[in-house]
Design a protein with these regions (language model features):
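Basic, polyanion-binding surface patches
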Residues: 2-200
Length: 200
């Protein structure tokens, strides 16, 4: 079976330790059977530059077209799963399915995150993903939006004697690694890895 790209609207983190996420897919989608059979997939975060490709991959079926070829996207070999990521995406999250929940219009795939790859260009000085620099895209009610500026840090509403930056920008820096609790995360160079305790 060939690989495919599907645009998923319903997705999100569901557990910190072990790191897990979920995606919900209609049963009639071409990618549904691929994921159901292989029990793995890669989540690729999308950017402003990838918005047209994101839309195309949501309205065209892999039964009829090769989306990698049509959108000039590059398959990125994965570290832990056979499913490829998308090289043009700033973040590739490799997942293995642990459970499938039949809900209604969609089935929900619960999956453990087994590896994460992050483009070095979007890492800050602390080795964390710089959300502002990535210019990520979100989707709501049939429309695409870029994410806004940082508004604050978790806990800033009750913090004392610690100045908080509201709507500030993080400086753009390069790094060789990123971190996610319990999961090794590599930069594109793949030369360095490290682990760090995550935050809820």
């Amino acid at each position: 079976r060939k690989t495919d790209i599907i645009t998923v609207a319903w997705a999100g983190t569901i557990c910190s330790d072990p790191a897990m996420l979920s995606i919900s897919v209609r049963k009639n989608r071409y990618s549904y059977d691929i994921i159901k059979e292989t029990k793995e997939f890669v989540v690729n975060l999308t950017t402003k530059q990838l918005c047209r490709a994101t839309d195309y991959c949501g309205v065209r079926s892999g039964r009829d077209v090769d989306k990698f070829q049509e959108m000039h996207l590059t398959p990125q070999p994965s570290e832990k799963v056979k499913a490829p990521g998308i090289a043009e995406s700033p973040v590739n999250i490799e997942c293995r399915v642990t459970q499938v929940l039949e809900l209604g219009t969609h089935d929900m795939f619960l999956a453990e995150v087994v590896a994460v790859r992050v483009d070095d260009d979007y890492m800050d000085e602390n080795g964390r993903f710089d959300l502002n620099a990535a210019d990520l895209v979100t989707y709501s009610h049939g429309e695409y939006f870029t994410l806004g500026k940082k508004l604050g840090t978790f806990g800033y509403s009750v913090a004392k004697n610690k100045p908080q930056s509201i709507a500030g920008n993080n400086p753009k820096h390069k790094s060789k690694s990123s971190t996610k609790k319990g999961v090794k995360a590599k930069g594109r160079s793949g030369k360095h890895t490290r682990k760090e305790k995550g935050k809820k």
